[in-house]
């Protein structure tokens, strides 16, 4: 069973040098797609005991819990380092995640995180402006309908990475 929560799958031997590389890739894709379709991510999240390591871990868990509680259609993570977006991603909630960052390197890294739509954003002068554009980016990136709830999380823009301390519920 493929329930180990990985964002990526890699085939090395058979796909690179084996006799049946196309079949190997096709089979792995079918298994992964089947597993994704038949996994109840919300139940898994709600029924798993959570033990947070630090405040960032706890905030990431709270974001996911809040997204489910308010029936949010998206979570937007404003992240300099990408760490918060990756932590939110690991909880596998059935809510789309937009990972906003100003760093092209982090933007590329977020594309490998489960359920994350990475968005390369400009730097914003303050948190209020960042939150405004976060909601707008989610609406554009995910084609959200008017009235949809969005959870936005981030931290002070002047401090750099690792300072996520805010969670906000917005309505598109």
Name these PLM-found stretches.
Residues 1, 88, 150:
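Conserved, mostly hydrophobic/aromatic
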Residues 27-64:
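Long, charged amphipathic helices and adjacent flexible linkers at domain junctions
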Residues 84-86, 92-129:
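Nucleotide-binding motor/catalytic cores of P-loop/tubulin-like NTPases across gene-expression machines
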Residues 3, 7-8, 29-41, 68-72, ...:
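Generic secondary-structure signature for well-ordered alpha-helical cores
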Residues 15-37, 167-169:
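C-terminal helical cap(s) of enzyme catalytic domains, especially alpha/beta-barrels
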């Amino acid at each position: 069973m493929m329930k180990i929560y990985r964002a990526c799958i890699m085939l090395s031997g058979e796909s690179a040098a084996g006799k049946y590389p196309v079949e190997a890739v096709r089979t792995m894709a079918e298994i992964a797609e089947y597993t994704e379709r038949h996994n109840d991510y919300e139940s898994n999240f709600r029924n798993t005991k959570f033990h947070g390591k630090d405040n960032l871990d706890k905030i990431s868990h709270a974001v996911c819990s809040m997204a489910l509680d308010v029936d949010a259609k998206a979570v937007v993570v404003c992240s300099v380092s990408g760490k918060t977006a990756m932590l939110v991603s690991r909880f596998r909630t059935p809510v789309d995640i937009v990972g906003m960052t100003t760093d092209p390197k982090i933007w590329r890294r977020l594309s490998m995180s489960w359920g994350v739509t990475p968005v390369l954003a400009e730097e914003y002068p303050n948190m209020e402006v960042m939150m405004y554009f976060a909601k707008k980016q989610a609406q554009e990136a995910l084609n959200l309908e008017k009235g949809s709830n969005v959870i936005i999380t981030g931290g002070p823009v002047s401090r750099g990475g690792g300072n996520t301390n805010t969670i906000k519920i917005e309505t598109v």
